[in-house]
Amino acid sequence: MRLLPLFLMVTLAASGCGIVESKKIDYKSSNKLPTLEIPPDLVAPTADNRYAIPDTEGSGTATLSTYSAERKAAPSGTPSLLPAQDKARIERAGTQRWLVVQATPQQVWPVIKDFWQENGFIVNLESPETGVIETDWAENRAKIPQDVIRRTLGKVLDGLYSTAERDKFRTRIEAGSGGTEIYLSHRGMMEVYATEGKDKTVWQPRPADPELEAEMLRRLMLRFGVEENRAQTLLTAKQTPDQARVIRDAGGSLLEMDEGFDRAWRRVGLALDRVGFAVEDRDRSKGTYFVRYIDPDADNASKRDEGMFAKLAFWRSKKDQASPQLQIVVDEAGEGKSRVRVAGGEGRAADAATQNRIINLLHKELK
């Protein structure tokens, strides 16, 4: 009889085998997912129900196919969320890849927000002014090692175990001449021991993961109707040659890109996301991004010494500590080229050390 409890535990664990292992990505945020809403600054009020949340019979998610099917019964004078004939494709330059969808930003916005929620993230920031949707920090539960004990306990206390990594994603939406361009960037943190005695841990940034970004782009392509085989083919296309170089002089550094202004402007925006800058505002007519550096300690500070379960509520949003505002300026240089320079908060010249540091960071992303 003493073997019965053990037998039941093994049976329960076996029944869950393959659930987590079959997923390379299984994110979970610590808070309840908010209701899907359309940013009021993007969509003008209308009397019809074109932007209503599709009825998914209580599942809490909305798919493009369900949305389209439900809207066929209620035609409108303007297109629904994404017309069936529209396609999505991948474009790339240097090490960067982005998605181009034949739809307006107003149509794309709710699909992207719902996409992140369906993948286990909380949408922490929505900025229609800058076209940014950013998730909260979340852990990839698929990285938790699985054994009999952990699988069994996980059925009762899912949050008992956690990983030493957290991820967040920022999606930037830009209206382009060939459709809406969607740029996706990843930021990561990892927990490391702060003392030799391993009695204290701290969180520190880890490099952006291009493979993780590619996987999320692949999933997003599927959401926009691209077949899986086609999505994988588009992602594995050959990388383009270097298209940017650093130019230095006595006054500092600037970056020269083999791109016209329109494309250079959008690529610089993605690069700023990836290297850890918060874009507070932008003025495309002047080619200027107004940015602040995101302090990882302020963005990801944990509660200290609150017991074993404090970790379960670790990722809580906090306002970034104030840092000097900078201007990243993109100038048309003629002959299909653009130049990127760094200025101070009021347009004055930034010091040479700041210029060199930021230009080098951008070069790694834009070359």
Curated annotation (Swiss-Prot):
Residues 1-16 form the signal peptide. InterPro entries: BamC (IPR014524), BamC_C (IPR042268), NlpB/DapX (IPR010653). It is found in: Cell outer membrane. A lipid is attached at C17 (N-palmitoyl cysteine). One of its GO terms (cellular component) is cell outer membrane. It comes from the Bacteria. Its main location: membrane. The keyword Membrane applies. PROSITE patterns: PROKAR_LIPOPROTEIN. One of its GO terms (biological process) is protein insertion into membrane. This is Outer membrane protein assembly factor BamC.
